[in-house]
């Protein structure tokens, strides 16, 4: 969500901060700002509503420069998107603060600070933090201690970066429930909400642990734990290769990432399967002891990852015979859960920092689960550190807010898990099909131009209906989510068998209905449902197996290359991604950074 960048250097850091923000744009934001302490120890700030480029233009007009500073991209939570609510926020013109997260007790703290004489100029919870730190600094004249004491009074999940004009040589950071990274350079050190922002600037990084605070100077970074005790944290080398964040020949990151799926699935499978078995060590050292005694499975995730879990339920129950329950993390964490004996708890997240998913994992660790397994794309994430077992997908950095390659690698991971838990020879057929999956994806990507030709038929639509049966129902859900995320068309998905129970009332000559129709045991049932749509004049678009002889009957048939039955949910996802992409491009929306959305949802 919000992006934080900060630096203390022997050189001017304004351009470094700006470049860091550019690398964080993918997280989603509505405003941006920067604050630096200049050579005369004056605190200078520039804020704008809109894009980072607008901030760059404004910075040129003010000639802002300095050796210590912080910068921020804001995704609105408290207070509307505006320059007034943009970060950094100031207190008494001395303290500047950037913030990612939510301070839940901000109203109580605001009233308390008003009684102390503080005045507020914004609608944000962030300004509360700035004034509270100023209050404690007045008592102690120690910026690190002031930040630590203020954070102890604040409830919620947040990360802060703070500078003080009277302390131009230092930058203070603290993390409570929201990720923050410390970066080591030469004659300069950094903070950021994502290591991606530090590539080519920092040589190595520390991933702050829960409750950590840090004092950053040009010469050193000192880290303190939640008890304010000086500690040593692991230092990790940082890959400075920036090519991975370039679009290359593609117009958008999303299209690039769609076309990377064959490669990243190959990478995810590599050295983890052969023709007869799944290497259980791929799921962590404990997996070989845990898997044989699993009797039930609970999967908890959000958004696209939740859809991956829904598909996995079909595979795990069919192949492994294990009762599987799938829940949305924000619902799971607030209800009483009955945990059967020997239940494996699985969390799924691209970033490994999704707030509700992490909270669900922490809740599960206090419950009677056999063990926890995290399926995640980021090796250094909190989710990975906290789980008993881990499967790392190898999707690489995903910039587009609408997830594509992260989703299909999650599905590949789940299909491997189902094969690993399967107790009969069907596992070998699954493994054979998995080895064919990258080639199947390549063939499907050749449909790009055909799918693009459909886009004009959707440009003026307001609604769309997606249908699937069985394991293809979650695929339809994912297709609908992609279309609504980036084209802003209201799209819903239903099991095709539910048409007569309500959704059929929506079907008319203006309603596009998209169906996912692989050659499986439910195909004839699906055809009957689609006849109901045709009979009512619905605009029917059917993604069909190219080996099938369909009678169009007024429907637009889009033929998908044949694939193994176990692979169909993965393969049929790709043309739906392409459809959403091309419709969004035709409508002129911001494909990589759709309105109101964030890449990594790090607040509740």
Curated annotation (Swiss-Prot):
Pfam families: GATase_6, SIS. It comes from Legionella pneumophila subsp. pneumophila (strain Philadelphia 1 / ATCC 33152 / DSM 7513). Catalyzes the first step in hexosamine metabolism, converting fructose-6P into glucosamine-6P using glutamine as a nitrogen source. Residues 279-427, 454-594 form the SIS domain. PROSITE patterns: GATASE_TYPE_2, SIS. One of its GO terms (cellular component) is cytosol. One of its GO terms (molecular function) is carbohydrate derivative binding. It comes from the Bacteria. The lineage of its organism: Bacteria, Pseudomonadati, Pseudomonadota, Gammaproteobacteria, Legionellales. The active site is at 2 (nucleophile), 599 (for fru-6p isomerization activity). This is Glutamine--fructose-6-phosphate aminotransferase [isomerizing].
